[in-house]
Amino acid sequence: MSKVLVLYYSMYGHVETLAQAVAEGARGAGSEVVIKRVPETMPEDVARQAGAKLDQEAPVASLEELADYDAILFGTPTRFGNMAGQMRNFLDQTGSLWFNGQLIGKVGSVFTSTGTGGGNETTITSFWHTLAHHGMVIVGLSYAAPELADLSVVKGGSPYGAGTIAGGDGSRQPNEQELALARYQGRHVAEIAQRLHG
């Protein structure tokens, strides 16, 4: 049985919702799944004033534990076509894991949320640079997910990874097609991790 970590940052809860769907998909493939988040770097009063969702159930991950998993699915909001600063800050502290090759051969995948749909693909592909430097096996979503080709509804996601479009004011929540893509990505990554790591 493979061990899968779903590691995310979510300011308003959209990525948190996707993370839960990703985890559900990975569990459906028979993997042991843990959901964790990266630390918030914004002062609490500033986050509160911005309307951030501060009551997220997932515990905060430690850097060292990343090496304990066969696959890691990373979730982040899009910030100007890049990952959120909180995720970047966390990953910038993984130098010792890189130096010791502790993530080499582990499966890595990314899902995202964006306000208006802009930057989701560049967020994922720029995230892949970090995964490649760690020697991770990068896995996208693929067009095998039938919801990806469904043009009857507005949705986030691409062959690079699942996603949601939150709307400019953040009021739009992930729809069923977006959650289905997230579940598919979790299952897909877990199945590949099982093939690679037993």
From Swiss-Prot:
Disulfide bonds: none annotated. FMN binds at residues 10-15, 78-80, 113-118, 133. One of its GO terms (cellular component) is membrane. Residues 4-189 form the Flavodoxin-like domain. One of its GO terms (molecular function) is FMN binding. The keyword Thylakoid does not apply. Keywords: Flavoprotein, FMN, NAD, NADP, Nucleotide-binding, Oxidoreductase. SUPFAM superfamilies: Flavoproteins (SSF52218). Belongs to the WrbA family. It holds the Pfam family FMN_red. NAD(+) binds at Y12. Its EC number is 1.6.5.2. Binds 1 FMN per monomer. This is NAD(P)H dehydrogenase (quinone). It catalyses: a quinone + NADH + H(+) = a quinol + NAD(+); a quinone + NADPH + H(+) = a quinol + NADP(+). InterPro entries: Flavodoxin/NO_synth, Flavoprotein-like_sf, Flavoprotein_WrbA-like, FMN_Rdtase-like_dom, NQO. Its cofactor is FMN. Substrate binds at W98.
